[in-house]
């Protein structure tokens, strides 16, 4: 869903309109798109999603569970069905929708997914959501500057990485497009490129640490 190389061209109309994605959105809705491997999903992910939902005034947050992260080894990744089930276990509340839509769409990279969803749900105010750890490596994503031009982006603070992420290549490149956190609620209505960094209480869970504990338990 994410990284490296030039973005493919996705038709602005046609096939996207026929897709059955398992959720319905109406024009004018404010919708966060939260993509990731979620391998495994944990309360830190839920914290990022809920922080963005409440601070931005979002109607829905769609967790896009990727078929496979191109930067991660396949043997380290659980099946998409397992990761979707894990995400649903921690995604609390009716505003949270966990989806494997990318497998149905046939996209692997965020920029392509965004273009399909924008064509499918015209008039919906999408915001891309990521943790600060993702912002630190955002410049490695395929078509990352195009992502910034497609939708506003909300970055939520994460332990140990927030300072590094705010001095990352992406943060520097789009420094003048950063929205003050006090104006975060207006981000979905802002013409991109626009992004906000949301600070707040931190959740220290991480997928890496959870996988390591699982490996040790099996040893």
Identify what each model region corresponds to:
Residues 2-219:
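Nucleotidyltransferase catalytic core that binds NTPs
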């Amino acid at each position: 869903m994410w990284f490296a190389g030039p973005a493919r061209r996705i038709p602005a109309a046609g096939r996207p309109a026929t897709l059955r994605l398992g959720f319905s959105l109406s024009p004018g809705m404010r919708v966060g798109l939260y993509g990731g491997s979620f391998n495994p999903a944990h309360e830190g992910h839920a914290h990022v999603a809920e922080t963005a939902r409440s601070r931005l005034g979002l109607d829905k947050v769609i967790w896009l569970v990727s078929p496979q992260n191109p930067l991660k080894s396949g043997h380290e990744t659980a099946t998409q069905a397992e990761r979707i089930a894990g995400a649903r276990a921690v995604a609390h509340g009716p505003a949270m929708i966990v989806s494997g839509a990318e497998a149905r769409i046939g996209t692997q990279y965020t920029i392509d997914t965004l273009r399909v969803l924008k064509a499918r749900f015209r008039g919906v105010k999408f915001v891309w959501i990521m943790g600060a750890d993702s912002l630190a490596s955002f410049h490695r994503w395929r078509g990352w500057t195009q992502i910034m031009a497609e939708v506003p982006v909300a970055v939520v603070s994460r332990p140990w990485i927030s300072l590094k992420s705010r001095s990352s290549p992406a943060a520097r490149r789009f420094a003048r497009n950063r929205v003050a956190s006090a104006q975060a609620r207006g981000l979905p209505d802002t013409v991109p490129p626009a992004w906000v960094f949301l600070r707040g209480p931190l959740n220290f869970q991480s997928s890496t640490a959870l996988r390591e504990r699982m490996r040790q338990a099996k040893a």
